[in-house]
Amino acid sequence: PEASYTLEEYFRKNFDPGIMALFTGELGFSEEEIEGEFRFWQDWVRTRIPVAYPGIREILQRHKEAGGRIAVVSHSMRENIERDYRENDLPEPDVIFGWEQPPEQRKPNTWPLEQIMERFGLEPQELLVVDDLKPGYDMARAAGVPFAAAGWANDIPEIEQFMRKNCDHYCKQVSDLARLLEAGDLPSACRRLMVCACEDVGLAYPQIIPIVKAAVDIA
């Protein structure tokens, strides 16, 4: 009862060290107190549906239509995630790993990403984790998966500074994520260029292949 935080202070602590580390470390919650916090949280979200950021639905729809997968790794409960996606008319996720998982299978543990890769036959570089908090970043880094920071979630300078410095991609606006998914990262773009040079343009103009190869190496 003697501890109090402003909303911005809470955001900082939720970012790092994360919610459970805050509860068990700085606040020293007992198991009973953590269970009470969980019940309070569930009562709160039961009657409150968050509204998706403008543009998110269109991004997810295009991603699915292009053959992409949507996986949710969250500290929310699966039933709440399914409801929120449904109420916001978002594409149904292909897989969800929520708070109902045992602690050792929640982020920042890499278990959810390992399951996603195994289920869909993907390599780490074929995934992209999009998150606004450090536990998601830590999970992606430990699994060798590219990470894009959802910078539109807050305007806290320390968080933005960390994300810009350490993440593969920093998306300040939702539209930045749209551009990232449509354009791809640099290695992917270079691979596409080499395929075009060798299989398409190269058939008619073989001399283009070493030119493109040199440009790709520089990039």
Predicted features and spans:
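A generic structural signal for short coil/turn motifs at secondary-structure boundaries
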Residues: 46-47, 70, 104-107
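Substrate-recognition element of Asp-dependent hydrolases with the DxDx(T/V) motif
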Residues: 37-38, 59-88, 97-99
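N-terminal helical cap/lid subdomain that shapes the substrate entry/recognition surface
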Residues: 1-57, 65-66, 213
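Asp-based, Mg2+/Mn2+-dependent phosphohydrolase catalytic module
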Residues: 78, 82-219
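Residue-level marker of regulatory loop/turn positions in helix-turn-helix DNA-binding domains and
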Residues: 52, 73, 105
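Residue-level marker of alpha-helix boundaries and capping positions
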Residues: 10-11, 50, 72, 126-128
